C-alpha cells in the first residue's frame, strides 16, 4: 500500500512539474516585447486614460498591477534597427546584449499611482521623447526587453 501511494504522489509531482516548469525559466520573447511595449499605430496623446486602457488591454493588470511600463509609438522596423547599434552592458545584469537608440523615440510612460491597488490599477500617463535601451537576442537580433529610458 505504501509503494502505491508513493507512486501516485510521484506521478502527480511529475505532472505538476511538467506543467509549471516551462514558464519558470522562460526567456523573454519578441512576442512579449511587442505585446508589452509596441503601439506603433497611435501617436502619443494627452488622454489621461491611455495607460489604464492599454495596460488592461495588453494583459498587464491580470493578477497584479504592473508598476511601470513604456509604450513605443514607432514602427517595428525603427525599434528593431536599434539592435544594430553599439552593444552595451545591461542595467539589470552583466549581459552585454543591450543597444541604445541613436535618436529619441516617441514614448508613453505608464506609472502606477501610489494609492492604486489591484484589482483597480490606476496609472499616470506621461508622453515624451527619450532614448531607449533595449536587450536584443537571436539571429537576426530582435528586441526582447526594454531595459531603460534615458
Swiss-Prot record:
This protein's UniProt keywords: Disulfide bond, Endonuclease, Hydrolase, Lyase, Nuclease, Secreted, Signal
Domain of life: Eukaryota
Matches recorded under InterPro entries: RNaseA, RNaseA-like_dom_sf, RNaseA_AS, RNaseA_domain
EC number: 4.6.1.18
UniProt subcellular location: Secreted
Catalyzed reactions: an [RNA] containing cytidine + H2O = an [RNA]-3'-cytidine-3'-phosphate + a 5'-hydroxy-ribonucleotide-3'-[RNA]; an [RNA] containing uridine + H2O = an [RNA]-3'-uridine-3'-phosphate + a 5'-hydroxy-ribonucleotide-3'-[RNA]
Catalytic site: 37 (proton acceptor), 145 (proton donor)
Keyword Cell division: no
GO annotation terms (biological process): defense response to Gram-positive bacterium
CDD domains xref list: RNase_A_canonical (cd06265)
GO molecular function, one term: ribonuclease A activity
Disulfide pattern: 51-110, 65-121, 83-136
Record-linked SUPFAM superfamilies: RNase A-like
Residues the record lists as binding substrate: 35, 66-70, 91, 111
Enzyme class: lyase
Signal peptide coordinates: 1-25
Major localization listed first in the record, in broad terms: secreted
Protein family (similarity comment): Belongs to the pancreatic ribonuclease family.
Function: Endonuclease that catalyzes the cleavage of RNA on the 3' side of pyrimidine nucleotides. Acts on single-stranded and double-stranded RNA.
PANTHER family: RIBONUCLEASE, RIBONUCLEASE PANCREATIC
Self-association state and partner proteins as the record states: Monomer.
Name assigned to this protein: Ribonuclease pancreatic delta-type
Species annotation: Rattus rattus
